[in-house]
């Protein structure tokens, strides 16, 4: 068999971009996108994407391999650009609309972006970002994504900064003779995403056509997404390209329900109006839904994929009681989508609801396309005991892993190591049944008296308190123990009787080992978060440093009072 070699017919580059062309053929007359009273079919979406792609080089002069950025929420243009930009042979860079101008300016310069599509509500943000470019530094062209938003008209001066509007490209583009640019190699870059920076400065993650193709299909299979689902975009498309579902929903001919902003009322209304079947949501969104005054049983089951921070069992229990069917996955920007999921076993359906929620809060096992997953000692690289207690670092092997960090070979080498593994920086235990459970980021593990304290475990106990809305636990220096847990808590709105710090601590003592109980609980109106909704623990650690703690007296200069 030695003469049987790969040939072009059996080794053409993998890419997710072909999903759109197929959707236009198979589901051409079916609804692809809904936004308020606007809707498109898959045939129309395909045509619109081709027209925009044709203009990116011919009208706007962007060359193959260069970067094009998008600063927009979950509106139809944002969805289309996930196809149109790479169909032009250039690299897509979705930027978070919640970032500040300084950060966006750094990202645009770091990526050397040549063109930025800007949503109407982000115009001032992007103009401020571009104004921060050093003198004589080339600035990207700007294209306006206009929207009929009441009271949000742009000034003539602002409009002068834009070469055209998005719909101008749709009108003048060529969908008849233009052929979308297929990658020469499946290893060619397709997207550039910046990490959220929960523990450090954001890094530019580059993914190939191959990795996106693999993780997209893998995520659909693992979640069991059927043909033609109705998918509600509660997950920002700028967050790792919506975990790959921007391309995945096209692969199965689904309907994308777009929304500019969301809260509990909007989500529940859209679910009922469009008979939504699927959505993705960070645990913070699940918490919002379960505590929403509009929360009531759903008219049909809604499958929800959650990820990011480990969801507390109490939040899962409350959300599922409304009719949401929660699946729990694990991934990072560096893997784009879900690569570890809590594969559900039928026999678990017979367990009490509280036990089901506990099992579902675990991250689980590798997805079908992720080749290997392990939890190892970060120093020796040896697998930890499968006892559900011994903590180690999650390591991965598989096609979903990024090419590397843009212009940062040192950071790339730190996580993609010579031993063949990708080191995630996430700390976990492996249970006897082979399911892993994240306990912390490596930087967030609290070492108290020689014991490893999982901040996630302490937070889960706090979340189970009926008055607690959000909780975050960080390490506080302690002269005797080395470190001790320090808790920040927000309480649910409308509480008639607000618990005291003493009552919260007593509650924790009933739930946790003595060395895991926080020494202090600080009540805050809100917790600092990244633009993707993750709690910024590094900010909380800085707050702790300023609070005048004295371990000998076990007191804080401030802190017992509300902040």
Swiss-Prot record:
Residue ranges of region SBD2? 329-405
Which residues make up the binding site for ATP? 195-203, 328-333, 426, 438-441, 534
Q: What are the protein's UniProt keywords?
A: ATP-binding, Cytoplasm, Ligase, Nucleotide-binding
Give the main localization category: cytoplasm
Recorded hits in Gene3D superfamilies, A to Z, give: 3.30.300.30, N-terminal domain of ligase-like (3.40.50.12780)
Give the residue ranges for region: SBD1.
Answer: 263-328
Q: Which Pfam family, any one, appears in the UniProt record? A: AMP-binding_C
Q: What class of enzyme is it?
A: ligase
Cross-referenced InterPro entries, in alphabetical order?
Answer: AMP-bd_C (IPR025110), AMP-bd_C_sf (IPR045851), AMP-binding_CS (IPR020845), AMP-dep_synth/lig_dom (IPR000873), ANL_N_sf (IPR042099)
Q: Name one GO molecular function term.
A: ATP binding
Q: Which GO terms describe its cellular component?
A: cytosol
The compartments listed are: Cytoplasm, Cytosol
Instruction: Give the Enzyme Commission number.
Output: 6.2.1.-
Q: Which domain of life is it from?
A: Eukaryota
Domains as described in the record: Both substrate-binding domains (SBD1 and SBD2) are involved in the substrate recognition, and are sufficient to confer the substrate specificity.
Q: Which family does it belong to?
A: Belongs to the ATP-dependent AMP-binding enzyme family.
NCBIfam families to which the protein is assigned, alphabetical: PRK08162.1
**Name of the protein in its database record:** Probable CoA ligase CCL11
Q: Which organism is it from?
A: Humulus lupulus (European hop)
């Amino acid at each position: 068999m030695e003469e049987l070699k790969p040939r072009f017919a059996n080794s053409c580059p993998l890419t997710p971009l072909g999903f759109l062309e197929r959707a236009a053929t198979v589901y051409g007359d079916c609804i692809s996108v809904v936004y308020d009273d606007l809707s498109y079919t898959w045939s129309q979406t395909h045509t619109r994407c081709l027209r925009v792609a044709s203009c990116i080089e011919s009208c706007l002069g962007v060359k193959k391999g260069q970067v094009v950025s998008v600063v927009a929420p979950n509106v139809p243009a944002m969805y289309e650009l996930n196809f149109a930009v790479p169909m032009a042979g250039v690299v897509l860079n979705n930027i978070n609309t919640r970032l500040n101008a300084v950060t966006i300016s750094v990202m645009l310069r770091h990526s050397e972006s040549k063109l930025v599509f800007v949503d109407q509500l982000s115009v001032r943000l992007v103009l401020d970002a571009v104004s921060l470019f050093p003198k004589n530094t080339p600035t990207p062209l700007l294209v306006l994504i206009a929207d009929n938003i009441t009271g949000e008209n742009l000034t003539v001066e602002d409009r002068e900064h834009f070469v055209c509007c998005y719909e101008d490209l749709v009108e003048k583009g060529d969908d008849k003779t233009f052929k979308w640019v297929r990658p020469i190699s499946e290893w060619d870059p397709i997207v550039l995403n910046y990490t959220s920076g929960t523990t450090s400065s954001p890094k530019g993650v580059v993914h190939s056509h191959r990795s996106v193709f693999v993780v997209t299909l893998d995520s659909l299979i693992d979640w069991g997404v059927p043909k033609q689902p109705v998918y509600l975009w509660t997950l920002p498309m700028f967050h790792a390209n919506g975990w790959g579902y921007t391309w995945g929903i096209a692969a199965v001919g689904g309907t994308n329900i777009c929304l500019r902003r969301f809260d509990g009322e909007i989500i529940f209304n859209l679910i009922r109006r469009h008979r939504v079947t699927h959505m993705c949501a960070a645990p913070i969104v699940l918490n919002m839904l379960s505590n929403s005054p509009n929360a009531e049983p759903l008219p049909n089951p809604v499958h929800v994929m959650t990820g990011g921070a480990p969801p507390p069992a109490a939040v899962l229990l409350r959300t599922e009681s409304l009719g949401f069917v929660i699946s729990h996955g694990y991934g990072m920007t560096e893997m784009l989508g879900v690569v570890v999921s809590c594969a559900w076993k039928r026999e678990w359906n017979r367990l009490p609801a509280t036990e089901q929620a506990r099992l579902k809060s675990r991250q689980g096992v590798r997805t079908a396309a992720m080749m290997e997953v392990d939890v190892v000692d970060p120093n020796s690289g040896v697998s930890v005991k499968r006892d559900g207690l011994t903590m180690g670092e999650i390591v991965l092997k598989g096609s979903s892993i990024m090419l590397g960090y843009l212009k940062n070979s040192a950071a790339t080498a730190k996580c993609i190591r010579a031993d063949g593994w990708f080191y995630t920086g996430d700390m976990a235990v492996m249970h006897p049944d082979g399911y892993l459970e994240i306990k912390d980021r490596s930087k967030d593990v609290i070492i108290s008296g020689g014991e490893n304290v999982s901040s996630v475990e302490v937070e889960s106990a706090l979340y189970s308190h009926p008055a607690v809305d959000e909780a975050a636990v960080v390490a506080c220096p302690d002269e005797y123990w080395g470190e001790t847990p320090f808790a920040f808590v927000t309480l649910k709105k409308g509480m008639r009787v607000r618990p005291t710090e003493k009552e919260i601590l007593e509650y924790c003592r009933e739930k946790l080992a003595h060395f895991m109980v926080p020494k202090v609980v600080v009540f805050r109106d809100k917790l600092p978060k990244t633009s993707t909704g993750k709690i910024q623990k590094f900010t909380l650690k800085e707050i702790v440093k300023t609070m005048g703690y004295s371990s000998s007296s076990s007191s804080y200069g401030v802190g017992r009072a509300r902040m």
